[in-house]
Swiss-Prot record:
GO terms for biological process: defense response. Has the structural arrangement of an alpha-helix connected to antiparallel beta-sheets by disulfide bonds (CS-alpha/beta). Pfam families: Toxin_3. Beta toxins bind voltage-independently at site-4 of sodium channels (Nav) and shift the voltage of activation toward more negative potentials thereby affecting sodium channel activation and promoting spontaneous and repetitive firing. Highly potent. Belongs to the long (4 C-C) scorpion toxin superfamily. Sodium channel inhibitor family. Beta subfamily. Residues 1-65 form the LCN-type CS-alpha/beta domain. InterPro entries: LCN-type_CS_alpha_beta_dom, Scorpion_toxin-like, Scorpion_toxin-like_sf, Scorpion_toxinL, Scorpion_toxinL/defensin. It comes from Centruroides sculpturatus. This is Toxin CsEM1. It is found in: Secreted. Its main location: secreted.
Amino acid sequence: KEGYLVNSYTGCKYECLKLGDNDYCLRECRQQYGKSGGYCYAFACWCTHLYEQAVVWPLPNKTCN
């Protein structure tokens, strides 16, 4: 499974500025999901190699504001 890293409280994606390989995204994805990968895609952190139950953006009933 893959998807955008999401803040479970706000429903917002984790933003990033350096597209492609990105240490911040990799660190955040691994911190939240263990052995996942991560990079910056469309100015948000995209996590790879997630388990199927991983929670990713968008969250039901939560809009980012």
